[in-house]
Design a protein with these regions (language model features):
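N-terminal secretory signal peptides
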Residues: 1-12
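C-terminal segment of N-terminal export signals and the immediately downstream linker at the start
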Residues: 29-70, 83
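Conserved, mostly hydrophobic/aromatic
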Residues: 59, 71, 109, 124, ...
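Acidic (Asp/Glu)-rich catalytic clusters
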Residues: 61-63, 125-133, 161-165, 225-227
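Acidic/histidine-rich helix-loop elements
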Residues: 73-89
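Glycine/proline-rich, positively charged
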Residues: 80, 149-227
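Glycine-rich, proline-tolerant flexible connector loops at the mouths of alpha/beta enzymes
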Residues: 111-127, 182
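Alpha-helix-loop-beta-strand connector modules within alpha/beta enzyme cores
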Residues: 125-138, 194-200
Length: 227
């Protein structure tokens, strides 16, 4: 990568990823809603959840009609592994949750290579594969927190496609920018050439929207010079 691409300011960063692509997802608690006879554990009751009341927002760039409520796939239900060594994702429960969410208007699903001990993307892919791809919006992330190398980062990116069983990703996010400051950001995305790589992937259509996710305060969100 050319040297000038390694010097990024706030304006350049927002121009690259597009501030509108920074998507915040609500972790849906739909499993508790789908209980027999509308009874939620703890003794309270619920009325039937309507299937035609979802609110949608249309993106400016792509004209995607995305549900206001997104499904965060960070904590899928688990069951004990048959070998007794830890837990595994309960795929039947995940399928049921996804079906219920889609039936009630949710069409945005957010995951990551590191969620649920690394199994979220595969489980999410299995569940979503049972539904028409063109009606869904899948978001995942470049979660290269420990190994910043270009080789590892590209391998993580490509495995997301394999596990999610898709040939394009609607929203690809730089995961949790701001943590570690500008030096960590540059190491994860700039110095290793990943930003350049991801921009080319977007041009090729394998990434429809390139954005970022973030946890923290404004001063950590904008650690870049304001040029």
């Amino acid at each position: 990568m050319e040297e000038h691409n390694k010097n990024i300011n706030r304006r350049d960063f927002l121009k690259i990823v597009g501030i509108s692509a920074a998507t915040t997802t609500a972790a849906a608690t739909l499993y508790s809603c789908k209980q027999k006879d509308g009874v939620i554990p703890g003794g309270s009751t619920s009325t039937p959840v309507p299937t035609d009341k979802m609110t949608y927002r249309t993106s400016v760039a792509q004209k995607d009609r995305v549900s206001l409520l997104g499904y965060g796939c960070m904590r899928w239900p688990t069951v004990p592994s048959p070998d007794g060594k830890g837990d595994m994702i309960d795929q039947d429960a995940v399928n049921e949750l996804v079906d219920y969410a889609i039936a009630h208007g949710v069409n945005y699903f957010d995951t990551s290579p590191v969620y649920v001990q690394g199994w979220s993307e595969k489980s999410t892919g299995i569940a979503l594969k049972r539904h028409p791809r063109e009606k869904l919006f899948i978001a995942t992330k470049l979660s290269n927190f420990s190994n910043y190398s270009r080789e590892n980062s590209i391998a993580m990116y490509r495995k997301s496609f394999e596990d999610l069983q898709t040939d394009y990703i609607d929203y690809y996010l730089l995961h949790s920018i701001g943590n570690g400051g500008i030096e960590a950001f540059k190491a994860r995305y700039i110095d290793n050439g990943m930003m350049e790589f991801l921009l080319k992937e977007r041009e090729a259509g394998r990434i429809r929207n390139l954005g970022f996710s973030f946890h923290g305060t404004v001063d950590r969100l904008y650690p870049f010079p304001a040029g």
